[in-house]
Amino acid sequence: MSKINAVRLINVNYNNNAYRISDETLHFNGKSTLISLQNGGGKSVLVQMLTAPFVHPRYRNTKDRLFESYFTTNKPSFILVEWALDQGAGYVLTGLMVRKSQDMEEDRKENLDIIGIVSEYQSPCIQDIHHLPVVEKGKKEMILKNFNSCRQLFETYKKDRDMKFFYYDLTNYAQSRQYFNKLMEYQINYKEWET
């Protein structure tokens, strides 16, 4: 069974935007991991974010926090999880790009714009968890690319036959289904995460 190798969170705000994770990578290296934080340190937030890419929308909420409450602007947030594949077969990056919906239609079901991504690779590359170019690091600050720029980047990667890169608009039922089917190819079964 594949194991979680690393997790990267970019532009995740919580506790009514009082706390912000700008760009953090947690290295699990496929091992069991204990995360010890003080009360209010973000343990529940971390668990909610880690499960979000692997569950359907209604399972992304907890009894205390709606998933959509973390995303209050048009700037994208990223929840990225890298898996080490069995028998040294490489890695697969799974994750979400999320922002508050910019569509003002009243009958819209989703309050978020969500893109699911899946990228398979053998070794470090431009579309891996560490190098995916969704942020630019300046001398003093990190500059986050906008949602549409990232989507165009993903489209370029998807068209490149040398890359095994896929992205899905998870607000579209058919594409959401394709995304979860793609995860199943790597034995990432949403049913195991939703129980």
Q: Which residues make up each language-model segment?
A:
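Extreme N-terminal "head/tail" segments of very large remodeling/mechanoenzyme assemblies
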Residues: 1-140
